[in-house]
Amino acid sequence: MGKKLVMAQKRGETRALCLGVAMVVCAAITYYILGTTVLPLYQKSVWTQESTCHLVETNIKDQEELEGRKVPQYPCLWVNVSAVGRWAMLYHTEDTRDQNQQCSYIPRNLDNYQTALVDVKKVRANFYKHHNFYCFSAPQVNETSVVYQRLYGPQILLFSFFWPTFLLTGGLLIIAMVKLNRSLSVLAAQK
């Protein structure tokens, strides 16, 4: 009976130890992936200063108005605001500026032009309802653009690193409990 209990205990310890090591390895892989994808985007984001933006004007540009340039196949909302004592171009997110520097907002549904136009008009109406709103500006003096919503802010970074940290802590606790259990069983066997 005692030998069966020791064998079952060893198998359970081995399984728990493998679980703990697997959790630590998964956490390390996740840290690596997040460190190479999310962290550089967070460090690249220059819009760190939260400020109040005041709406100056909005305009919906269609294909006809953008002659001579790369013409987007969707209606383009252009928003000009006053922020931190200077005029600036408002972009919905950091990615909006990278996709098209002429547009403040790019609609979600780009397949249907009329649906995209309705979406752009709805966003424009929201700007007219709320003339003052919070935005993010760059601390550099020569920056002429502001961002309405940060995709890569500190909250996203904290949320991204929470689960791998939880996984790493859980794995280390399981490994520590198995080691503690082994040392206590050795001490009990010596008495």
From Swiss-Prot:
Glycosylation site positions: 80, 142
Q: Which biological process terms from the Gene Ontology are attached to this UniProt entry?
A: cellular response to bile acid; cellular response to ethanol; cellular response to hypoxia; detection of calcium ion; positive regulation of potassium ion transmembrane transport; response to calcium ion; vasodilation
What's the superkingdom here? Eukaryota
What the entry lists under PANTHER family is as follows: CALCIUM-ACTIVATED POTASSIUM CHANNEL SUBUNIT BETA, CALCIUM-ACTIVATED POTASSIUM CHANNEL SUBUNIT BETA-1
Q: Which residues lie on this side of the membrane: Extracellular?
A: 40-155
Q: Which family does it belong to?
A: Belongs to the KCNMB (TC 8.A.14.1) family. KCNMB1 subfamily.
Give me the gene this protein comes from: Kcnmb1
Q: Which GO terms describe its molecular function?
A: calcium-activated potassium channel activity; potassium channel regulator activity
**Subunit comment for this entry?**
Interacts with KCNMA1 tetramer. There are probably 4 molecules of KCMNB1 per KCNMA1 tetramer.
Q: Which organism is it from?
A: Rattus norvegicus (Rat)
Give the UniProt keywords, A-Z: Glycoprotein, Ion channel, Ion transport, Membrane, Transmembrane, Transmembrane helix, Transport
- Tell me one Pfam family matched here: CaKB
The keyword Cytoplasm is annotated on this UniProt entry: no
Question: What tissues has this protein been observed in?
Answer: Weakly expressed. In brain, it is expressed in a few discrete populations of neurons that also express KCNMA1.
Its name, as the record gives it, is Calcium-activated potassium channel subunit beta-1
Spans through the membrane: 19-39, 156-176
What biological function has been recorded for the protein in this entry? Regulatory subunit of the calcium activated potassium KCNMA1 (maxiK) channel. Modulates the calcium sensitivity and gating kinetics of KCNMA1, thereby contributing to KCNMA1 channel diversity. Increases the apparent Ca(2+)/voltage sensitivity of the KCNMA1 channel. It also modifies KCNMA1 channel kinetics and alters its pharmacological properties. It slows down the activation and the deactivation kinetics of the channel. Acts as a negative regulator of smooth muscle contraction by enhancing the calcium sensitivity to KCNMA1.
